[in-house]
């Protein structure tokens, strides 16, 4: 089995943002030259997440509204006693998880017809990283 590692580094423009990173994941897969296996995509920050879903703007707005309903910003989070003000960002990241694993078949991401990889930022406007680890033959 072979392994290939790549990192994405970017600055998000907004405090909360959803970025389709599928092209970058596909680029890492091409660089790896791995034909069969799996690819791990993981946010390297505790207030961010990675998910697989449809790249449709209405759905992204629905996801954002759902996350805000389940984990709204509040002054009274215990985490804020540490001097931080991002308790809701931590909770939102728990809801979407921080990583995904995608099968690789014939040197391609083995997705359904609408699936895309998204990076979800909940405490942005500063440098962030994502690790991409390709494993296989």
PLM regions and their residue ranges:
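Active-site histidine-anchored catalytic micro-motif
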Residues: 1-137
């Amino acid at each position: 089995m072979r392994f290939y590692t790549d990192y994405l580094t970017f600055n998000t423009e907004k405090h909360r943002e959803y970025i389709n990173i599928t092209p970058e994941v596909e680029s890492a897969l091409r660089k790896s030259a791995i034909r069969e296996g799996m690819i791990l995509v993981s946010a390297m920050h505790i207030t961010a997440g990675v998910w697989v879903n449809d790249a449709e703007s209405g759905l992204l707005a629905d996801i954002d509204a759902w996350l805000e309903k389940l984990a709204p910003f509040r002054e009274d989070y215990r985490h804020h006693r540490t001097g931080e003000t991002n308790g809701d960002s931590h909770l939102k990241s728990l809801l979407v998880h921080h990583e995904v694993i995608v099968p690789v078949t014939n040197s391609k991401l083995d997705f359904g017809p609408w699936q895309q990889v998204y990076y979800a930022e909940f405490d942005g406007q500063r440098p962030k990283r994502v690790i991409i680890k390709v494993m296989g033959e």
